[in-house]
Amino acid sequence: MKGSYKSRWVIVIVVVIAAIAAFWFWQGRNESQSAAPGATKQAQQSPAGGRRGMRSGPLAPVQAATAVEQAVPRYLTGLGTITAANTVTVRSRVDGQLMALHFQEGQQVKAGDLLAEIDPSQFKVALAQAQGQLAKDKATLANARRDLARYQQLAKTNLVSRQELDAQQALVSETEGTFKADEASVASAQLQLDWSRITAPVDGRVGLKQVDVGNQISSGDTTGIVVITQTHPIDLLFTLPESDITTVVQAQKAGKPLVVEAWDRTNSKKLSEGTLLSLDNQIDATTGTIKVKARFNNQDDALFPNQFVNARMLVDTEQNAVVIPTAALQMGNEGHFVWVLNSENKVSKHLVTPGIQDSQKVVIRAGISAGDRVVTDGIDRLTEGAKVEVVEAQSATTPEEKATSREYAKKGARS
């Protein structure tokens, strides 16, 4: 009984497995048959589909810009440092105790503003002594002159000798000399008293104080009381290659002030604009450069002493120049070239002669004309005569020129 029961279960399991296998076989055959007509139809419709894809792949995408005609400024550039127009260390010209400071650190001051005071007591005493001596000698001189006048009258009647008259004349002259010396002493004492009040010698910004109130200071102190830097105006000192000297001199002879721009350390933001002040009188033989100084009004305090800046000096403007983006200009074995697009969006290599150039645009002196479209991006995929797809047209400069560039791209796409 038990053996018959086990045999029955084995038969059931085998039947179930066979049924499942038959179902999967039938299902796979139906899917294969339903897919075959579609594949046959597709093969009939496109007998050479694979070969066609290999024969004509997608067009290479590029970006293009239109060469434009415009006035282009010519700049000379150099690295420079901002320097104060004047730097003055304010020192005391008399010895004494510092009684007061009349400025705030970092404050802008005018020439003549009171900065500090030295104890004036000793100078007032010296002035009073000099004035007293002057008054005494003034009275002595007046008396000597009166005696001389009497001697002169008596000499006419021979009541005094000639020797006595000459002696009185000499006494008057001596007293006059003493009186003049007393006047000088009074002036000197007054000057010493005036110097006890220390004033700003120039307009500018005061720095940090170098001495505190209460200290004894002297005219021989080298550190001084405070340093004033004149920043209105302020100067920019930079260098140019000696090869640019002729260009600068010729521009100066034209009679117009040369504009100099100060740009920040990253050369991305213009800080201020000034004019050329002077060229140095000799070239640095070590570096082959010449120092140039420009002056800026700096009323907005955009420039600060010892600040590092990039200098740009406008020396000329090239009129009616053909300009393209710098990205379009390439260099090969034959020289500089650009890829030019025709009306069918086919490219051809044109050798060109570049001129003034910066990071954004370049002047082309020969090789293309205004209105020509040049490839600015996707250049590595180009071959002579290849047809391309212009995916974006960029202007060389202004929004108006950008619109013109788009119009050229549309015309090429329609052709």
From Swiss-Prot:
Ranges for region Disordered:
34-60, 392-415
Bias kind Basic and acidic residues: ranges:
399-415
Briefly state the protein's biological role.
Answer: The MdtABC tripartite complex confers resistance against novobiocin and deoxycholate.
* Record's keyword terms, sorted: Cell inner membrane, Cell membrane, Membrane, Signal, Transport
UniProt-annotated location(s)? Cell inner membrane
Membrane topology annotation: Peripheral membrane protein
Q: Where is the composition biased (Polar residues)?
A: 34-47
Q: How does it assemble?
A: Part of a tripartite efflux system composed of MdtA, MdtB and MdtC.
**Which family, according to the similarity comment?**
Belongs to the membrane fusion protein (MFP) (TC 8.A.1) family.
Species name: Escherichia fergusonii (strain ATCC 35469 / DSM 13698 / CCUG 18766 / IAM 14443 / JCM 21226 / LMG 7866 / NBRC 102419 / NCTC 12128 / CDC 0568-73)
Pfam families per UniProt: HlyD_D23
- Where is the signal peptide, in residue numbers? 1-21
Its GO CC terms? efflux pump complex; plasma membrane
Induction pattern: The mdtABC operon is transcriptionally activated by BaeR.
The record's GO molecular-function terms, alphabetically, read: efflux transmembrane transporter activity
The entry's protein name is Multidrug resistance protein MdtA
